[in-house]
């Protein structure tokens, strides 16, 4: 059974052992034998990422290689990178480690959809052990240690409007786009209410940030450059066309309406957060925020696309997404009291080996 991956700051004992650390008293209790290490770790801030393949380091190639990569790789993305600084991606997790030691929880996975929990997944998603939005929310709800900060970036697979579309909808897509955006909001809202109900009963502060879908308009500028380069040199972007097997709406004929649907979805997300916040007036321990950081990031440079599939992000692409995503975390970090460094920081911060959540 698939479980979220938990990653603890590698040098967390050194960090919280410093007198100026906000967790120094917990460290002293641990050193005196009053608190076991497992309990000490639960007292660190916990940050969870809910999302789809945009939030992972996965890319598509041959079926077996993709299958192995999905099953065995984690991190190496804009949220979590397990390579010690300054190597790899300057991810959100590395930026957070400059402020505090913490526990990162990666729930995101390839192919994830914003779904109705009663829907049955197709065969491909089952063999990839895809966890849709409802499943990822469910994973958080059963955790003994509920996260302090929850980042949500999911829905990119839901804008594949041309997938299984009848010819009539392909020719006149307006009603289909409207229906898909409405259904998306209904399903997203239902899962958010589950999350909010659990967050409200915590005895500590919880911040949730919902990111809009990426800037597909600028993204396709880079994609078109990759397509031209491949037409000139077939050895480049070897699996560029493989994209169409999994994402019909990436075909040039359908892109303009994909961009439209993504904008519609982002409006629904913004309005949903505004509506949910009206019901949180008395919830002083919970902050809910919408961010357009990914929706406005400039993704038009071809080097931001992966050199194999020109679909998912390259290292440079993940760096752009990380910078954008972290920039909008300011209010959440301030709400949680994590906006100032705790203890000394060094350039050698890294993370431990990933472990499965129990």
Locations of regions flagged by a protein language model:
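Extracellular low-complexity, Gly/Ser/Thr-rich intrinsically disordered linkers
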Residues: 271, 275, 286, 292-338
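Short catalytic/ligand-binding loop motif for oxyanion handling, primarily in non-cytosolic enzymes
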Residues: 56-58, 113-116, 158-162, 216-222, ...
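A short helix->loop->beta-strand "cap" motif at the edges of active sites that frequently abuts
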Residues: 101, 199-206
């Amino acid at each position: 059974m698939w479980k979220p991956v938990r990653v603890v700051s590698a040098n967390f004992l050194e960090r919280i052992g410093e007198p100026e650390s906000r967790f120094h008293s917990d460290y002293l209790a641990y050193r005196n034998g009053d608190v076991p290490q497992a309990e000490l770790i639960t007292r660190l801030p916990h940050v969870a990422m809910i999302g789809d393949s945009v939030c992972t380091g996965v890319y598509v190639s041959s079926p077996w290689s993709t299958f192995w990569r999905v099953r065995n790789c984690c991190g190496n993305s804009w949220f979590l990178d397990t390579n010690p600084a300054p190597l790899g991606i300057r991810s959100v997790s590395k930026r957070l480690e400059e402020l505090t030691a913490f526990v990162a929880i990666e729930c995101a996975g390839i192919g994830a959809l914003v779904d109705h929990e009663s829907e049955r997944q197709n065969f491909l998603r089952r063999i990839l052990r895809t966890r849709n939005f409802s499943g990822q929310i469910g994973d958080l709800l059963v955790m003994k240690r509920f996260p302090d900060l929850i980042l949500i970036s999911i829905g990119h697979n839901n804008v594949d409007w041309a997938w299984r579309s009848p010819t009539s909808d392909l020719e006149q897509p307006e009603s289909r786009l409207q229906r898909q955006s409405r259904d998306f909001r209904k399903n997203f809202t239902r899962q958010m209410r589950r999350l909010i109900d659990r967050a409200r009963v915590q005895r500590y502060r919880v911040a949730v940030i919902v990111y809009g879908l990426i800037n597909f308009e600028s993204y396709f500028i880079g994609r078109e450059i990759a397509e031209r380069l491949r037409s000139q040199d077939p050895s480049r972007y070897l699996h560029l066309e493989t994209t169409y097997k999994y994402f019909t709406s990436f075909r040039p004929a359908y892109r303009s309406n994909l961009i439209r649907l993504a904008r519609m979805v982002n409006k629904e997300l913004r309005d949903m957060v505004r509506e949910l916040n009206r019901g949180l007036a008395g919830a002083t321990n919970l902050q809910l925020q919408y961010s357009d950081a990914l929706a406005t990031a400039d993704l038009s440079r071809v080097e931001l696309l992966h050199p194999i599939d020109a679909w998912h992000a390259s290292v440079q692409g993940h760096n752009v997404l990380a910078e954008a995503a972290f920039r909008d975390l300011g209010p959440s970090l301030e709400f949680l009291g994590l906006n100032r460094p705790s203890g000394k920081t060094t350039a050698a911060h890294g993370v431990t080996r990933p472990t499965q959540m129990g």
